[in-house]
Amino acid sequence: MARISFSYLCPASWYFTVPTVSPFLRQRVAFLGLFFISCLLLLMLIIDFRHWSASLPRDRQYERYLARVGELEATDTEDPNLNYGLVVDCGSSGSRIFVYFWPRHNGNPHDLLDIKQMRDRNSQPVVKKIKPGISAMADTPEHASDYLRPLLSFAAAHVPVKKHKETPLYILCTAGMRLLPERKQLAILADLVKDLPLEFDFLFSQSQAEVISGKQEGVYAWIGINFVLGRFDHEDESDAEATQELAAGRRRTVGILDMGGASLQIAYEVPTSTSVLPAKQEEAAKILLAEFNLGCDVQHTEHVYRVYVTTFLGFGGNFARQRYEDLVLNETLNKNRLLGQKTGLSPDNPFLDPCLPVGLTDVVERNSQVLHVRGRGDWVSCGAMLSPLLARSNTSQASLNGIYQSPIDFNNSEFYGFSEFFYCTEDVLRIGGRYHGPTFAKAAQDYCGMAWSVLTQRFKNGLFSSHADEHRLKYQCFKSAWMYQVLHEGFHFPYDYPNLRTAQLVYDREVQWTLGAILYKTRFLPLRDLRQEGVRQAHGSWFRLSFVYNHYLFFACILVVLLAIFLYLLRLRRIHHRQTRASAPLDLLWLEEVVPMMGVQVGP
């Protein structure tokens, strides 16, 4: 039986074909896609990293600004994470107690505690002063604890009761106690150690009540100033002026100059390596240098500092005036005896004092001797007369009174001048702040040359600072000349030295040496927090590091995925080539077949 087959022919427009994609074209597309995605990811990574690194200084600067603003607000005593500390400054004229607080340590062993002075509900510093000084208890040491009771009761009322047992108390005695015999010093301290723990629950032991030296007091003052200025924060480089470094990762600290009424003090950091000195100077340098570590771990040396600190008794502004008057009195009376003159013996024939304003009259009395003086306002001559009072030696490495002074790198240093350095430049001259020697000399010379009547009239008209009084007007000429001589002739500061600032406040607050004392005394406390939060610190370190390194991890993962896609496409390409070669004979066979027309019979 014959077989009949039919073939149905459709219009040509009904047929369609799918073009075969060239393997070469597909490979090019894959490579272009891979290159484009890689470039895009790299660009995003660069932009994000630049944004992150650029935002860090701004964030740190903003955080420091918020911290300074927060220091002026009332302390939140309800915060359980706050710790407290007390420092009693037992001075010569009175005693003061300062209350400090700080949050938990941030867990970084390279950072110091963030200690601030406590403020009450009215945002006022928590501090109290009593008079007289504790040295008044020299003959009745058994009443020393009674003497300090008002201060400690005041502090106990401000520190939360549940924090009393963990609040350290430090009683540090200064000049007044130093003048007492050691036997009386020990008797006063023994009474404090015995009686105070019976009444107050503060953390207090025998080692926390002591008489500190002038050197220690100067070191504490240096620590406090540099801490407030942020010079111990080595990772913060937002302040371009403050980031000049002494070594890698180490910010430049500032030196301090402080001239009071009776004494003068200087303190500044010196390099750890110094030149070889003669034997006598080497011994003097060891006495005047203090090396200490503010860090909580002795293994970390980024907070090791070597500071030169010296206190000069008798070189303060008021005491220097007394020494000057003694000098003038003795020289004038001796000259009168030798030459038969009567200078200064009566108001009609006064001694013409170059260190007083023009026309100002005064009387110098020593025992039964009297010297009448009248100002002639010669600032340059005044400085020349003050030069012998500096008691300098001929050696180049000696300052006032022939005392050794460590070299100062005036090209890479910065100093702050307090007390008389600020009063002399600001109270009447109104040029406080950044000090410029020639400008100060010109202003001081002009002031000294004015008549006393003109100065008093200007004072009545309110042209001087609100802190100025008649005593300041009277002795401004002398004190400005004395300050100038001490700075440039005594300490050898260049006349055009640009990095001295005179100040009364730092960031709108007075900085006491007690802040530096509690920073030093509590330097090991962060170890407690570090041990308690060891596990959390490890996790915190991972999250901090992942902020940066997750970008690289993500980028690496994308590259792995793209590589897998590329290998997969390459695999498909090879499979396609095999299938193409296998189907080639079938295609030839198919082309040899004949497609019969519809209705045509094919034989058997």
Curated annotation (Swiss-Prot):
For this chain, one GO molecular function annotation is: GDP phosphatase activity
Q: Establish whether keyword Translocase is in the entry.
A: no
One Pfam annotation reads GDA1_CD39
According to Swiss-Prot or TrEMBL, what is its membrane topology? Answer: Multi-pass membrane protein
Active site (catalytic residues): 217 (proton acceptor)
What's an example GO cellular component term for this entry?
A: endocytic vesicle membrane
Gene Ontology process terms (BP): CTP catabolic process; CTP metabolic process; GTP metabolic process; nucleobase-containing small molecule catabolic process; regulation of immune response; T-helper 17 cell differentiation; UDP catabolic process; UTP catabolic process
Provide the family line: Belongs to the GDA1/CD39 NTPase family.
What is the name listed in the Swiss-Prot or TrEMBL entry for this protein? Ectonucleoside triphosphate diphosphohydrolase 7
Q: Which organism is it from?
A: Homo sapiens
The taxonomic lineage of its organism, from the top, reads: Eukaryota, Metazoa, Chordata, Craniata, Vertebrata
